[in-house]
A protein has these predicted regions:
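A short beta-to-alpha transition loop/helix N-cap that caps and shapes the active-site region
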Residues: 4-6, 57-61, 148, 174
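Short regulatory "switch" loops immediately downstream of catalytic or recognition motifs
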Residues: 29, 37-38, 58-61, 122-129
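C-terminal substrate-binding subdomain of Rossmann-fold SDR/epimerase-dehydratase oxidoreductases
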Residues: 76-217
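Hydrophobic, Gly/Ser/Ala-rich alpha-helical and linker tracts in large acyl-processing enzymes
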Residues: 60-73, 80-83, 89
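Short aromatic-enriched loop/helix-cap "lid" or pocket-rim segments at secondary-structure transitions
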Residues: 8-9, 60-65, 105-106, 151
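A short secondary-structure junction motif
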Residues: 4-5, 10-11, 60, 87, ...
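Catalytic helix-loop patch of NAD(P)-dependent Rossmann-fold dehydrogenases
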Residues: 2-55, 64-75
Length: 217
């Protein structure tokens, strides 16, 4: 999603214009795509598939594999689960005055297992020489926009755990709202996000509990 910047139209398709990145992280995403395209265009004997992730969240349903950020998490779900379990005192919600139904930012949250499956399909497509172009691009998202406050409420409902959160000022570089149009990936790759948001949030919480059980966090 970072390659699109602040989109003009929603949901975002692969043909949406690439705008100036709103953060250094977004800029690296755009640069990485340019490097891949330039490498293929140079005549290198390779093809490529660019998967444009939206917001991966969750963990493997067995709770044996998940996200373990170093230090203070830079994305929402680890910070949320660490707050829920008591590692962090409070979760900060950056802004409630955006032009969205509840004022908080909207994102397309995709289960990390669904995302991993998209990689398997993409690799098979390259190896089996099924690509229609030397470089193909696919949005990997659910097609559903969920606000930060909706996500918090969804976590509380899915787990029965109340979150201590506070509204703070906007964070520089945050995009107001963005979610994918995944139709091209659905139709061309035969891939579609399967996991519900509720199950994804439960998996994230189960992973955090497993970390506590192992004495890691």
């Amino acid at each position: 999603r970072q390659v699109y910047g602040e989109p003009d139209e929603l949901p975002v398709t692969e043909n949406a214009p690439i705008k100036k990145a709103t953060s250094p992280y977004g800029n690296t995403k755009q640069i990485n795509e340019e490097i891949v395209r330039d490498t293929v265009a140079s005549g290198a004997p390779i093809n490529a598939i660019l998967l444009r992730y939206f917001n991966p969240i969750g963990a493997h349903p067995t709770a044996l594999l998940g996200e373990l950020p170093n230090g203070v998490p830079q994305n929402l779900i680890p910070y949320l689960t660490q707050t829920a379990i008591g590692i962090r005192e409070k979760l900060s919600v950056f802004g409630d005055d955006y032009d969205t139904p509840d004022g908080s930012c909207i994102r397309d949250f995709i289960n990390v297992v669904d995302l991993a499956k998209a990689h398997v399909i993409a690799i098979a497509r390259i190896l089996e020489k099924k690509q229609k172009d030397k470089v193909e691009t696919f949005n990997i998202g659910t097609g559903r926009g969920v606000s930060v406050l909706e996500l918090i409420n969804g976590f509380e409902k899915a787990t029965g755990v109340k979150l201590n959160y506070q509204i703070v000022g906007r964070r520089a570089g945050d995009i107001e709202k963005v979610w994918a149009n995944p139709d091209y990936a659905n139709n061309e790759l035969g891939w579609k996000a399967q996991e519900t948001l509720e199950d994804t949030l439960r998996s994230a919480w189960a992973w955090q509990l497993k970390l506590r059980e192992r004495g890691i966090q």
